[in-house]
Amino acid sequence: YNLTGAIQKYGVQKQKGWHAINLFFNTSAGGQNTVLSDESFARPGDYVIMKALKNLTCGTSACPSDIDPCNSWNPTDIFVRTYDKNKEFTKSFAFRMKTDAEPKLTKNTGFYERTSKLTRNFVDARGYWLPNDYTKHGVINEYTACREKAVVIDLSALRKFEILGPDAEELMNYTLTRNVKKLSIGQVVYSSMCYDNGFMFDDGTLLKMSDHGFRWICGDEYAGEWLKEQAKKKNYKVRIKNSSDQISNISLQGPNSRKILEKFIWTPPTQPKISELQWFRFTICRIKELSGIPLLVSRTGYTGELGYEIWCHPSDAPKVWDVVMDAGKDEGLIPAGFGALDLLRIEAGLILFGNEFDGQVDPFEAGVGFTVPLKTKNEDFIGKDILIKRKENPQKKMVGLELAGKEKANHGDCVHIGRSQVGIITSGCISPTLNKNIALCRIDVGHSELDTEVEVGKIDGHQKRI
């Protein structure tokens, strides 16, 4: 009513009600279709930018709620600013590593100059814009190219940390579940990173760069702060540097990936050639010649196919992209986005933060128990005592499901035997290769045997089963 009266004089017709956009409230729908509210994600100074498609009329109406947590129990003013239509703004989300940290706006990667010419479908990947798919190809074609030929994927959103100093090995051996002391220079290992309670909050790959230098590549920017905290507690002589903005990386995956790399990679006599590079190893190299762009190439990936990852400085990224695409033009190489990557990793049974683990399950429950070598790693590491007990008394297990119907199972769907819930779907997809409906599921160990029949529940788990 207040809004109608305020803007009628501008020629806006009277209406019984107005559509509302929830900009700063933290609300959700409960299980019984009730609206729930909680502490707002917004902080003083946060803003939302909107573009008017027609003439814009602004009106304000007070809603000083101090009886619920939506305004943090303390109503504050909301200010509206208008800008000239020619004013340019970068499309961004605000990302906070911690609740009290300053917000960081979504960034472009070093490869954005090239990828933005091929697609407008970008997703925010923990503070970086990455392609979800490419206009000319689409998810299924990109997936197929990876299985049959080759694809290149921008994965620059991965966080990179340099761990340097005489106690670098001690720190990483203490904070990771894998036995870091077994690594040789040039070797890579995949590992879990756990809290004291044994719950897994991050995973990643560790590269041994030198006797006193390691590079931790992971998904969570908080991992760097956490490493600093542990180093301080143990009084380790080590420096931890965030190099995420100094290193861009693309993943070259597929049966033809080695052939493509061999066309332009130059390696010095002291480094392994691409043809010699073994699984979970890396080489220091250049493009074409000694004076070419410096690169690090690792034989790693996230697709289940033969693959490599190429690491370079962001300023060199556009040229690196051009060289890779040119080398792959006769090998069926196309760019691929996150949509295809998700299909590939689910088929391969590879885990994803927020799906298979979220800081509330241990590595055994997440399906990566092999990263916890309790029999061969004698040194102490964070979470070891709890993980020993949890391995002896497992409660959940990660399994693969084949669904009979055509409706895809989604993350969070409940899994039942009769009325009893026995598990939860962590990821699901229609597999193009298998031509089957498949899913990853964390299930009670008592129902994890092969060929056990279960039902996936939708809505409340009982009104609909698939």
Positions of predicted regions on the chain:
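Active-site nucleophile-adjacent alpha helix/oxyanion-hole segment immediately C-terminal to the catalytic cysteine
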Residues: Y1
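...with weaker cross-activation on analogous glycine-rich loops/strands in unrelated enzymes
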Residues: G5-D84
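A short catalytic or substrate-binding loop motif that flags glycine-/basic-rich loops and adjacent residues
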Residues: K16, P69-S72, D196-G198, Y302, ...
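Short, hydrophobic/aromatic-rich segments at coil-to-beta transitions
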Residues: A42-V48, G186-S191, K396-K397, S448-E453
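Extracellular structured ligand-interaction cores
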Residues: G45, W73-T76, L158, G213, ...
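Acidic, proline/glycine-enriched N-terminal capping motif
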Residues: N86-C194
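Conserved, structured C-terminal
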Residues: N86-V123, L130-Y134, L207-I466
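Internal amphipathic helical hairpin motif
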Residues: P166-D202, R258-I293
